Amino acid sequence: QIYITNNTLDREKGILKDLLKRDDVAGMIVEGTKSGLPNPNLELYRHLMMRKIPLLFFNTYYPELEVPHVSLNDADTAYKAVRYLIEKVHQNIGAVLKLDDGQGRQRYLGYLRAMEEAGLTVTDSRLVWIDTDESKQLAYCRDRLLNRVEECTALLAYNDQIAFQLIRMLEER
């Protein structure tokens, strides 16, 4: 069975409580909800673990839980992307990253490493942190976003959905 949290903690909590009432849960493959923030549902995961229900996290995980996880190396991927932009002679490189997912933090670390190695300045004004709701409709924060990246010659986007929206906004401008 597949459950979808839509990256909301309340939905995750409801799903976990429902699963704890069942006796037929053989295991779970989980993509963490708002994994870049403290999670109030960790105790529910601990109850599942006490019941010996196997958990495997993918893409991201909660460091407070000792569970196996499979993830991309988001820091290295962002590092390589920013290095590519630097090799193309960009110096004013900004980033649009998600603040509520663990991947956003990891991608930021890769961005920082590439910029620092190249001796380029990391400026807060070139960074835009968005949450899950904003990522679905960047138009809601259009003015703030465009003002922050106005001086940038290149941007690291959190993912392809963000990149697509950014391209459309910049073309309309």
Predicted regions and their residues:
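Core AdoMet radical
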Residues: 30-31
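Bacterial carbohydrate/catabolite-sensing allosteric modules
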Residues: 2, 7, 13-27, 39-173
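Active-site core of PLP-dependent enzymes with the aminotransferase class I/II
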Residues: 35-36
